[in-house]
């Protein structure tokens, strides 16, 4: 074996006939780095003596004709071996490239025994907050040269640049941090940890201006904000100072916010999505506010993070205005708990890699918000152990730098505070002063209805509770205590079995009482059970709930069963609000129907409503399939066949396709049919959670994604330039749903029609939101195919069609003609 030069790297990328062990190499790209300089490149095609699949041809652009002229691997093996045998072997996913190349070289008589370094794992550790670690995504974020992705030399060159960026970043980190990482670096694949050791030798000691060491952890120091700059009363000028152009309707929206500021009534402002509403309300309010704090509430933590990373960050940089985001304590890292895990032995390789990732992250984060770690869902058990519980000992080494405490205190004094709807409801329930005398903005205010409903519910994970109870049966407990554990476990398991076997979703008052009695008897015998596992169940029965039901979900590929409870009446949002300086409700849809508005459902009688007219979309169109059969008139099997056949034909257009379902059963039925014809696709729950299948879809693993639930209104497709969205059915709510029944009863009491005044307009709203999932930025083009014939045949269909026509161009015709038009539209 040749002597390896630890300062010389061979960065290798292979293209092959597949991703399996029996694959043949079809292209080799090698970049040699010496003394942190690219000194040589090498590339060659290789004749595999077998035809390529359509997938590989599409992915790489390599053709059979091209490879027919290429040399056999035996003709290039010696040159490749001598080029890389004295180097450290580096690749992005090194296991595949190194194993495949070593095997092919071995068959030609060359034994490759070089150290192996994986840039995927290095990137995960040293760029801890990225959403993805594909070479393409890293190239976008780090501005690597990847002009011809999935050709071997282009990928190898980009990986070489990535390696140099990684080395530069590692060597810039405090020497004390790298010393902390060294004991964990053996958990990295193969010899990847050697780069941590090399960087440690070159790194400098910690700069006390930028970092502080507390209790053995290296933390980033927060920098003081300069004096606040006063905003102009000219919206366009403020936008220009931010380096942005104000749009005409955005300026009008900002003027509406300004004009209504002195009104004592709550302002309901309606404006089309994509208008730039966030700057439209932030800039005028920051200019008008004197000493009042501005609180902006959004529906999700994701949107909260987006505002902090974009609009709030820019405003803070330009105007030196203090901006703070706050969530519940469980979103933040507890440094005491994390530090304890660093000394824990026996954790697996990937958990130890996450510890490295978090140690690096602590030198970057100013918030300690674990949502900054985008891939933590893979190890939720570990992250549960290190998240904050809201409590902090006075003796804690980290008392003065605790992220949750710091965030809580900063939130009291910041000029602009960003929260989410759920946090607002939880907070003001016990602390009205939190929002009193302040300026409130509820963005996407229509989501407050559902947030109120979720707030009025409690849920308990029955699967986990039964597992914990049965685990304690093995302990040495008194006989009576064991009998009570068995009784509670039996009651819960019995109800869950009826739910799965007989579809008994709802729990009777008698059954709920039996569970409550069993839980309270166990608690009365031994109060320790509250803290062992009964906290959630006892809290659920402590509320005046009248409705109980079961739900199931898949989490980390495992089925979880939940017992839910709620009251039978809608909560009145107005009762939550303290007396504020000013409150705005902002949404793209405030009027649900001519008879029902969002203000009505939230309990407001006195309010001021203003709106801006909508523009029609030109880069998104809707086609309605005239030939699609009505599901009510055919069997489930025939319905699934009809959808699958259309998906198969649309796939010939070679564009990304999102297919939305109302029913999980229909989604799985269609998936089975696509499997039968070997049409590769991804299906929510079958192939992972909504988050995971979306990530795989955007990574290019498949051109077809079947989804339901979150894909209707909570998942955006920003990265796709062109997309086809297939909506299989109109999204009417299930009339048996308890929340829908509450709304119906509320409207009937006011002599209004639950269908015409709520279910129908809500379906239109949900339909518009679904259509908007694939149209989230300029320069996107999206074709929407609606497969529900009720829009053409039912009396309410014209109402839906007219509502969509306000914003979109619509045509209805035979499927074959729609397919041709969609193809031309997306060119």
Task: Give the positions of each predicted feature.
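Signature of the SF2 helicase/ATPase Hel1-core->accessory helical subdomain module
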Residues: 390-416, 421-526, 590-602, 736
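Conserved RecA-like P-loop NTPase helicase motor core
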Residues: 627-635, 689-788
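Acidic, Mg2+-coordinating catalytic module of metal-dependent nucleases/exonucleases
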Residues: 88-95, 99-104, 134-196, 784-786
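A substrate-engagement module of RecA-like helicase motors
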Residues: 234, 292, 301-414
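A contiguous, basic/glycine-rich beta-loop/short-helix subdomain that forms a polymer-engagement track
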Residues: 391-412, 431, 522-634, 708
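Walker A/P-loop
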Residues: 262-283
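Acidic two-metal-ion nuclease catalytic site recognized across multiple nuclease folds
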Residues: 1-4, 165-235
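Conserved non-catalytic scaffold segment of RNase H-like nuclease domains
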Residues: 2-114, 128, 132-146, 150
């Amino acid at each position: 074996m040749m002597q390896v030069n630890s300062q010389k790297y061979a960065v290798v990328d292979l293209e092959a006939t597949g991703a399996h062990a029996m694959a043949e190499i079809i292209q080799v790209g090698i970049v040699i780095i010496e003394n942190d300089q690219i000194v040589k490149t090498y590339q060659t095609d290789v004749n595999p003596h077998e035809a390529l699949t359509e997938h590989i041809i599409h992915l790489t652009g390599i053709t059979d004709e091209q490879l027919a002229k290429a040399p056999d691997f035996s003709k290039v093996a010696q040159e490749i071996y001598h080029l890389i045998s004295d180097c450290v072997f580096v690749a992005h996913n090194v296991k595949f490239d190194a194993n495949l190349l070593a095997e092919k070289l071995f068959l030609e008589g060359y034994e490759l025994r070089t150290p192996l370094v994986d840039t995927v794992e290095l990137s995960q550790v040293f760029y801890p907050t990225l959403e993805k670690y594909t070479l393409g995504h890293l190239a976008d974020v780090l501005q690597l040269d990847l002009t011809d992705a999935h050709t071997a030399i282009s990928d190898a060159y980009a990986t070489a640049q990535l390696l140099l960026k990684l080395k530069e970043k590692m060597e810039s980190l405090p020497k004390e941090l790298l010393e902390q990482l060294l004991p964990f670096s053996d958990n990295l694949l193969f010899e990847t940890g050697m780069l941590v050791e090399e960087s440690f030798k070159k790194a400098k000691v910690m700069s006390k201006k930028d970092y502080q060491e507390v209790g053995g952890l290296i933390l980033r120091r927060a920098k003081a904000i300069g004096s606040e700059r006063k905003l102009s009363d000219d919206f366009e000028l403020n936008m220009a100072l931010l380096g942005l152009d104000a749009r005409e309707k955005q300026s009008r929206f900002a003027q509406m916010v300004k004009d209504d500021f002195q009104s004592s009534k709550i302002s309901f402002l309606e404006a089309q999505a994509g208008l730039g509403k966030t700057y439209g309300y932030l800039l005028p309010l920051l200019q008008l506010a004197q000493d009042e704090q501005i609180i902006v509430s959004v529906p999700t933590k994701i949107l909260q993070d987006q505002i902090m990373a974009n609009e709030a960050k820019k405003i803070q940089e330009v105007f030196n205005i203090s901006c703070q985001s706050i969530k519940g304590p469980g979103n933040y890292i507890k440094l005491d708990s994390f530090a304890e895990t660093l000394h824990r032995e026996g954790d697996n390789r990937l958990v130890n890699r996450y510890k490295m990732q978090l140690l690096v992250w602590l030198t970057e984060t100013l918030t300690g918000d674990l949502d900054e770690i985008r891939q933590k869902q893979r190890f939720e058990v570990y992250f549960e152990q290190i998240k904050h519980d809201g409590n902090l000992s006075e003796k804690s080494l980290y008392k003065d730098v605790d992220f949750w405490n710091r965030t809580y205190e900063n939130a009291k004094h910041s000029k602009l505070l960003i929260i989410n709807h759920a946090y607002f409801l939880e907070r003001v329930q016990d602390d009205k002063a939190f929002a009193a005398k302040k300026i409130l903005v509820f963005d996407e205010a229509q989501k407050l209805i559902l947030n109120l409903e979720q707030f009025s519910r409690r849920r308990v994970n029955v699967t986990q509770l039964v597992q914990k109870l049965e685990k304690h049966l093995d302990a040495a407990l008194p006989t009576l205590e064991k009998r009570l554990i068995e009784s509670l476990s039996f009651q819960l398991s019995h109800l869950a079995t009826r739910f799965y076997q007989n579809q008994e979703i709802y729990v009777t008052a008698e059954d709920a009482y039996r569970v409550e009695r069993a839980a309270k008897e166990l608690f009365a015998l031994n109060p320790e059970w509250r803290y062992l596992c009964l906290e959630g169940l006892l809290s659920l029965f402590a509320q005046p709930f009248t409705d109980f039901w079961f739900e199931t979900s898949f989490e980390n590929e495992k089925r979880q069963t939940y017992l839910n409870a709620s009251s039978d009446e809608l909560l009145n949002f107005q009762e939550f609000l303290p007396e504020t300086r000013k409150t705005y409700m902002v949404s793209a849809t405030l009027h649900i129907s001519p008879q029902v508005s969002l203000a009505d459902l939230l309990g407001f009688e006195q309010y001021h409503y203003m709106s801006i007219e909508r523009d029609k979309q030109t880069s998104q169109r809707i086609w309605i399939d005239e030939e699609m059969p009505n599901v009510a008139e055919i069997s489930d099997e025939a319905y699934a066949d009809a959808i699958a056949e259309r998906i198969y034909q649309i796939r010939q257009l070679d564009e990304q396709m999102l297919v939305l379902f109302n029913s999980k059963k229909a989604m799985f039925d269609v998936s089975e049919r696509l499997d039968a014809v070997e049409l590769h696709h991804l299906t929510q729950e079958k192939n992972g959670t909504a988050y995971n299948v979306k990530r795989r879809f955007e990574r290019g693993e498949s051109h077809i994604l079947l989804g339901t639930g979150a894909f209707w209104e909570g998942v955006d497709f920003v990265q796709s330039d062109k997309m086809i969205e297939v909506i299989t059915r109109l999204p009417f709510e299930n009339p048996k749903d308890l929340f829908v029944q509450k709304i119906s009863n509320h409207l009937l009491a006011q002599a209004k029609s639950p269908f015409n005044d709520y279910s129908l307009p809500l379906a239109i709203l949900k339909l518009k939101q679904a259509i908007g999932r694939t149209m989230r930025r300029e320069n996107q083009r999206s074709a929407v195919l609606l497969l529900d014939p009720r829009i053409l045949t039912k009396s309410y269909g014209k109402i839906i069609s007219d509502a969509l026509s306000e914003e979109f161009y619509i045509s209805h015709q035979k499927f074959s003609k729609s397919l041709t038009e969609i193809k031309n539209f997306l060119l």
